[in-house]
């Protein structure tokens, strides 16, 4: 009797603790740090002096409203962040689904060259990935796309699942990196014409209404007949199962692939 009475209280306490974890972690950071760097330093320096520092790049050719900055992340030698130069809080921001929205994932894929420069050589397209975390998993209130190497085990799983991944969102046959994801493929050497934010909101039932709980990951891939494309992955945060929707967990900030990769890099214009 006593044990049965205690269990609900323990479960409730555990659930409350799980809900608090992201907010407690966020308090250790300034949630506006990225925005202050981009808006307060990188953009003004680029405009005034043609120098994006402390960012690696600032692109304003389409205006601040559609521009972006590339910033070296503090974690890992190869990780970079693609950050809009307009104020966009996160994956749930309606600006990302506006008719004239910039395709930040396409810009992030182009920014993979910074990762390769940090490594010192090119990687095959399936060795590079992009990720946006859910609201529960992030510590910054400015949209940022993680750009880095893909974990070796994640690469191996996607390689195995590649033929079964279709052109519409569907649950994958097995977990990726220890978590269940939905996946789809898009074809092309770049993401021009394919906006993952829009594909998620329009292609997964209910996603448009709870984008704050979603995480998005994009991994380069080669499909049948060596055709270039991408695998898109999405997951919905589930705190009861300790899944906060942290897609960046599929990336490897130590880039073991750069040390162990035996496959040749793709030809320079087709990656």
What residues fall within each predicted segment?
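Bacterial N-terminal signal peptides
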Residues: 11-22
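HIT superfamily nucleotide-processing domains
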Residues: 27-271
């Amino acid at each position: 009797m006593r044990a049965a009475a205690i269990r609900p209280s323990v479960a409730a306490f555990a659930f409350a603790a799980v809900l608090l974890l992201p907010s407690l972690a966020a308090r250790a950071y300034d949630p506006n740090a990225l925005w202050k760097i981009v808006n307060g330093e990188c953009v003004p320096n680029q405009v005034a002096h043609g120098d994006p520092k402390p960012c690696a790049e600032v692109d304003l050719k389409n205006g601040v409203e559609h521009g972006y900055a590339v910033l070296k992340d503090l974690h890992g030698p190869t990780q970079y962040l693609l950050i809009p130069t307009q104020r966009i809080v996160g994956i749930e921001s309606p600006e990302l689904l506006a008719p004239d929205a910039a395709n930040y994932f396409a810009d992030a894929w182009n920014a993979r060259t910074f990762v390769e420069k940090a490594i010192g050589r090119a990687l095959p397209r399936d060795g590079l990935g992009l990720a946006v975390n859910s609201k529960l998993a992030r510590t910054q209130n400015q949209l940022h796309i993680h750009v880095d190497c893909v974990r070796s085990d994640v690469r191996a799983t996607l390689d195995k699942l590649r033929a079964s991944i279709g052109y519409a969102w569907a649950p994958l046959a097995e977990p990726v990196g220890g978590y269940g994801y939905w996946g789809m493929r898009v074809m092309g050497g770049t993401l021009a014409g394919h906006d993952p934010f829009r594909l998620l909101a329009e292609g997964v039932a209910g996603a448009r209404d709870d984008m704050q709980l979603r995480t998005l990951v994009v991994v380069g891939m080669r499909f049948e007949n060596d055709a270039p494309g991408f695998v898109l992955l999405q997951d919905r945060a589930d705190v009861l199962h300790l899944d906060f929707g942290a897609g960046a967990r599929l990336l490897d900030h130590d880039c073991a692939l750069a040390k162990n990769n035996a496959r040749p890099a793709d030809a320079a214009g087709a990656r």
